[in-house]
From Swiss-Prot:
Active site: 102 (nucleophile), 197 (for gatase activity), 199 (for gatase activity)
GO terms for cellular component: cytosol
The entry's keywords: Amino-acid biosynthesis, Aromatic amino acid biosynthesis, Decarboxylase, Glutamine amidotransferase, Isomerase, Lyase, Multifunctional enzyme, Tryptophan biosynthesis
A GO BP annotation: L-tryptophan biosynthetic process
Region annotated Indole-3-glycerol phosphate synthase, chain positions: 253-517
Region (N-(5'-phosphoribosyl)anthranilate isomerase): 533-768
Role played: Trifunctional enzyme bearing the Gln amidotransferase (GATase) domain of anthranilate synthase, indole-glycerolphosphate synthase, and phosphoribosylanthranilate isomerase activities.
HAMAP family registered for this protein in UniProt: PRAI
Protein name stated in the entry: Multifunctional tryptophan biosynthesis protein
Length: 768
């Protein structure tokens, strides 16, 4: 038989090595193609446990406390067919040694940000000559050796991230002098992969490669006594010039953050309820909160430049800034001070933020007349993070050009836009700016901080302005702390600035923002003091309605609750409705036109609601209901032409969104949700069922009002012409939050409405 030239390198009569105590619990993730791997590992003294990639969870894997992790070959693509493999690599990187073969190596490449693609040739069971760097798995091996390949995919040179180095390669068989990546290695972490099959009978020194790996015990090369930043004495050959590893350097803080986030996101994606499919299902159910267009909102500002106000508890460069900051409370301050965008850092380790911060910020801005857009400030590298941001209420996300390949950046950019979010694309150099402009980004942020050295140069933004089309919004990011920092930006066409640390430390947020942007604190909405709305409730006749309106009452209440003494039948209610809608407010009672509130300003929800309830030309008719069916309430509203509905029982809070007119809702002093925005137009503080003449405890009223600076209420309970002014005045500064007063029994005599008392009550309130 003719000699084929093939050499069988398998161990024909293998001798099992002594038990390795350091490899006492090797976990092999089987990607449905592991063949006899466990046998080869056992031959080198390892104790091996094998698990299919879809038959163990990451939590179960962690609980088994492996000493080393091996990822096997397998069919398909690493991003779709490797099961738990990638999540395991992300979690265990830096903790224990990891070795990947074929698809296992491809998982390593994609986990750290690289890409795999077709090699241009399909080799299954073919041998090639390997060139390697003599380190890691190749330590002590000859310069060139034969290996066996079973693959059509491999890592691509252009996408290998800085944290990885190419450790071996083979030349293509097409005489192109191009090579294919056969091995990669993390520069700091004990993570290594090979594209070929060491266990094949046609691969030389396969057992030695396994042995070299099983000697490793620590999660870093340094921990294993390996210093790959210096040329190894055992290196017998170098990888070809096309695959030469990039110059090693100290892992930058940005790379460390990215590596950590990749690991965390990989784990999160395996948790039931947080998996990509779970998020997509929630999005498909239209559960993402309403959004505002990011570029359009950036163009709206009460100041010469738009402000992107950042919520940041800490940073790698400054350490702890505001550990105890309440993100939603901070967001409301920023919004009321005129911010166009609120940036929420959601990275937990270095910046001490979370996606829950963003969710709470979005909820806190509900009901503002022109709420700021919300930016998820995060190290984004996966569509999953963008979808997560949208579901939490983000209007835009940050994409950092420095950390993304052009291919990945483009993919993430268009995915974000598909969710209705124009991203903020961050750059720092002319090269990165060109990428952002070519991408077609509508909003580009120039980071004045070098993310490698963390040095700040405020001139960075200025130097890049001439590369940007006039239609593009340019934002200056980082290092801005005072008015002098932004003066040049105004002249150069910069449209917005992002400020974080200085804002978090400011004693008076509104004053600092006004001074910073060269405006005035008057540029943002300032509510002028008006006397409270007057609501005359329990109206039972046309005469009483007419007297109340002519005295200057704003709201005429009629009781629609069957069985109550003040309940009016529909025919009487219709006649009262006609009176309310036909009699104008008396001269001098028409409120002045609102002045000094720029269109870009965000008005607090309850302030806006109070304006709506103060009709410019007539009183409004309020129908009072208590624990009655929603259908009945809606029917009566249409039949009687009610301008406002008052819910005085235990109706669901959500009904306010189902009723087509403003809703006043009664609350007791101990009831929750009194200050919940975007449901009831105004809360009404009252005792019991109302109409009893029982005064509320003044100190408890004060406590309720002091809990929320944006709360506005209608005050009821025992008020009459003789005490209403004094009760409101005793509340001091908190009395400004009483935007309406409600009276029923306080304007009655012997159970009937007293027209004189009605007039006296209105007059007393107008004097406040």
């Amino acid at each position: 038989m003719a000699d084929s030239g093939l050499v069988d390198h398998s161990p024909h009569h293998p001798t099992k090595a002594a038990q390795l105590n350091t490899a006492s619990n090797v976990i092999l993730i089987d990607n449905y193609d592991s063949f006899t791997w466990n046998v080869y590992l056992v031959l080198e003294g390892a104790t091996v446990n094998v698990f299919r990639n879809d038959q163990i969870t990451l939590e179960e894997l962690i609980a088994k406390k492996p000493t080393q992790l091996v990822i096997s070959p397998g069919p398909g693509h690493p991003e779709t067919d490797a099961g738990i493999s990638s999540a395991a690599i992300q979690y265990f990187s830096g903790k224990i040694p990891i070795f990947g073969v074929c698809m296992g190596q491809q998982c390593i490449i994609t986990c750290f940000g690289g890409k795999v693609d077709v090699t241009g040739e399909i080799l299954h069971g073919k041998t090639s000559a390997l060139k390697h760097d003599g380190k890691g798995a190749y330590e002590g091996l000859p310069d060139s050796l034969a290996l066996t390949r079973y693959h059509s995919l491999a890592g691509t040179h252009a996408t290998i991230p800085d944290c990885l180095e190419v450790s071996s390669s083979v030349q293509l068989t097409d005489d192109s002098n191009k090579d294919v990546i056969m091995g990669v290695r993390h520069k700091k972490l004990a993570v290594e992969g090979v594209q070929f099959h060491p266990e094949s009978i046609l691969t030389e020194y396969g057992r030695t490669m396994f042995r070299n790996f099983l000697k490793l015990t620590a999660g870093t090369w340094e921990g294993n006594g390996k210093h790959f930043d210096e040329q190894s004495n055992t290196t017998k050959a170098t990888v070809s010039s096309n695959t030469a590893p990039k110059t090693d350097k100290k892992l930058s803080i940005l790379e460390r953050i990215y590596d950590h986030r990749r690991a965390a996101v990989a784990v999160q994606k395996t948790i039931p309820s947080q998996r990509p499919a779970d998020l997509q299902a929630a999005y498909d159910l239209n559960l993402a909160p309403p959004q505002v267009p990011f570029p359009a909102r950036l163009r709206q500002s009460p100041y010469p430049l738009s402000l992107m106000a950042e919520i940041k508890r800490a940073s790698p460069s400054k350490g702890m800034i505001a550990e105890n900051a309440c993100a939603p409370a901070q967001a409301r301050q920023y919004a009321k001070a005129g911010a166009s965008v609120i940036s929420v850092l959601t990275e937990p380790e270095w910046f001490k933020g979370s996606i829950d911060d963003l969710r709470a910020v979005r909820q806190s801005l509900e009901g503002l007349t022109n709420r700021p857009a919300i930016l998820r400030k995060e190290f984004v590298f996966d569509e999953y993070q963008i979808l997560e941001a949208r579901l939490a209420g983000a209007d835009t996300v940050l994409l950092i050009v420095k950390m993304l390949s052009v291919e990945l950046l483009t993919r993430l950019y268009h995915y974000s836009r598909s969710l209705g979010m124009e991203p903020l694309v961050e750059v720092n150099t002319p090269e990165e700016m060109k990428i952002a402009v070519d991408l077609g980004a509508e909003v580009i942020g120039v980071n004045n901080r070098d993310l490698t050295s963390f040095e700040v140069d405020l001139g960075t933004t200025s130097r890049l302005m001439d590369q940007v089309p006039s239609s593009t919004i340019v934002c200056a990011l980082s290092g801005i702390s005072g008015p002098k920092d932004v003066e040049a930006y105004k002249k150069e066409g910069v449209k917005a600035i992002l400020v974080g640390e200085a804002l978090m430390r400011a004693a008076d947020t509104a004053a600092f923002i006004a001074e910073l942007l060269g405006g005035s604190s008057q540029n943002v909405s300032k509510e002028s003091r008006s006397s409270p709305l007057v609501k005359i409730c329990g109206t039972r006749s046309e005469e009483a309605a007419r007297a109340a309106i002519e005295a200057g009452a704003d709201l005429i209440g009629i009781i629609m609750v069957q069985g109550r003494t003040r309940c009016v039948p529909d025919d009487v209610a219709l006649r009262i409705s006609q009176v309310v809608k036909s009699i104008p407010k008396p001269a001098g009672q028409t409120p002045p036109t609102s002045r000094g509130t720029p269109a870009a300003a965000s008005v607090e929800y309850f302030d806006h609601s109070a304006r709506i309830l103060r009709h410019p030309s007539r009183a409004l008719l309020v129908g009072v209901f208590q624990n009655q069916p929603l259908d009945y309430i809606l029917s009566q509203q249409q039949k009687l032409g009610l301008d406002v509905v008052q819910l005085h029982g235990s109706e669901p809070l959500e009904w306010a969104k189902l009723i087509p007119v403003p809703v006043i809702r009664k609350f007791g002093l101990d009831e929750p949700a009194i200050a919940r925005r975007a449901y009831h137009s105004l809360p009404l503080l009252d005792s019991g069922v109302g109409g009893t003449g029982e005064l509320l405890d003044q100190s408890r009223v004060q406590n309720v009002l002091d809990k929320d600076s944006g709360l506005r209420v209608i005050l009821a309970g025992g008020l009459d012409p003789t005490n209403v002014a004094g009760i409101v005045q005793k509340l001091g500064e908190s009395g400004r939050k009483v935007v309406g007063v409600d009276v029923s029994s306080g304007v009655e005599s012997d159970g009937a409405q007293d027209l004189g008392k009605i007039r006296a009550f209105v007059q007393a309130v107008r004097g406040l």
